[in-house]
UniProtKB/Swiss-Prot annotation:
It is a multi-pass membrane protein. One of its GO terms (cellular component) is plasma membrane. PANTHER family: GH23382P, NEUROPEPTIDE Y RECEPTOR. The chain crosses the membrane at residues 36-56, 67-87, 114-134, 144-164, 213-233, 259-279, 283-303. It holds the Pfam family 7tm_1. Belongs to the G-protein coupled receptor 1 family. Residues 1-35, 88-113, 165-212, 280-282 are extracellular. Coiled coil: none annotated. GO terms for molecular function: neuropeptide Y receptor activity. This is RYamide receptor. CDD domains: 7tmA_PR4-like (cd15392).
């Protein structure tokens, strides 16, 4: 009787455990990780929501490049909503607490949003490459840009479709640490390739990493390197030399610098995590805990940086951010924000007047 009672108490205790890992049970470690993900979630969601609002609410901001930036912001919002909360909670608890229906849906949406962001960066780089290399040819239209964006979503959706097909709730003793989780109705959400062979699953995972990071990085490296060589080493073919065209060329250069910064941040944020995923089989579990969360957090934090880059390096986005902030009642009373907004608005009006005068002077006068 006593033995049965002891076994029952032990089983009850196992079911109440959040996870068997002593590191993940440490309150300071949990607090640090949850704080990191909470900051990423708030900053990324607010920043990218501002970007979406600025582009959609302001007709002058509805350019081809900004349409791509809008799509990039939407992808980052999805990453923020789907990757950060679900992944962080399930990893810290070491089981999937959200039910069987959400398991494949969330896993597919996570992969989709990451691929959309990567492919959108590629689309922007190709657009800039064509503008610089063939400046006399007409730019792609806004309608054609929407077709490209739709194609990005379609290709990304097809690419990650197997991840949804093979994602299910499973019990893995190597991850959960004990088979008692199965009896306690605690599972992990993961891709299960036992029906087709685990070697095919490993191959698909490597192909995904190649398509999500390696190929986009190579394309971005080629396009922006070529653009840099043309801008800083040669005069752009067909580029006029009057002040109006020089100002336009300067604006192009600023936009390209901004997008190069976005690409560099993307590469820096995702490279360590992808390297970790390649060598994860050769890393012990105790070390993996300390490596995974900082590097996964770095990759997820990529969604935070783009709005900051836009605000810092683009006057229109910066003014748009300030206008949105001024529309918030509690911030409207802040004199410093109000003064900055007035200064930037005045500068923008002065620039428009100068540009109008230059265009007027460049027009031929009638005899």
């Amino acid at each position: 009787m006593d033995a049965n009672t002891t076994r029952n108490e032990s089983f009850s205790l196992d079911c109440e455990l959040v996870n068997p890992n002593s590191t993940l049970a440490n309150v300071y470690f949990l607090s640090a990780v949850y704080s990191m993900y909470a900051i990423i979630f708030v900053v990324a969601l607010i920043g990218n929501s501002f970007v979406c609002y600025i582009v959609l609410s302001s007709p002058p901001m509805r350019t081809v490049t900004n349409f791509f930036i809008l799509n990039l912001a939407i992808g980052d919002v999805l990453i923020t909503l789907l990757c950060v909360p679900f992944t962080s909670v399930s990893l810290l608890m070491q089981y999937w607490p959200f039910g069987g229906i959400l398991c494949p849906v969330v896993n597919y949406s996570q992969a989709l949003s990451v691929f959309v962001s990567a492919y959108t960066l590629v689309a922007i780089s190709i657009d800039k490459y064509m503008i610089i290399m063939w400046p006399l040819k007409p730019r792609i239209s806004k309608r054609f840009a929407t077709y490209i964006i739709a194609l990005v979503w379609l290709i990304a959706g097809i690419t990650v479709l197997p991840s949804a097909t093979f994602t299910t709730l499973i019990n893995d003793e190597n991850i959960l640490g004990t088979s008692a989780y199965e009896q306690c109705d605690k599972y992990i959400c993961a891709e299960e390739y036992s029906k087709v062979g685990q070697e095919y699953g490993d191959l698909y995972t490597k192909v995904l990493m190649f398509l999500q990071y390696v190929i986009p990085s190579l394309v971005l490296l080629f396009t922006y390197t070529s653009i840099g060589v043309v801008i800083w080493c040669h005069r752009i073919p067909g580029e006029a030399e009057n002040s109006r065209d020089q100002r336009i060329a300067k604006n192009k250069t600023k936009m390209i610098k901004m997008m190069v910064t976005v690409v560099c941040v993307y590469t820096i944020c995702w490279l360590p995590y992808n390297v970790l995923m390649i060598f994860k089989e050769h890393i012990s579990g105790s070390v993996m805990v300390y490596l995974y969360f900082p590097l996964h957090g770095l990759a997820m934090s990529h969604a935070c940086y783009n709005p900051i880059i836009y605000c810092y390096m683009n006057a229109r986005f910066r003014n748009g951010f300030l206008q949105v902030m001024m529309s918030i009642p509690c911030l409207r009373r802040c004199n410093s924000i109000n003064d900055i907004s007035k200064i930037l608005t005045c500068r923008w009006k002065v620039r428009r007047v100068h540009l109008y005068r230059e265009i007027t002077r460049a027009q031929p006068t009638s005899a």
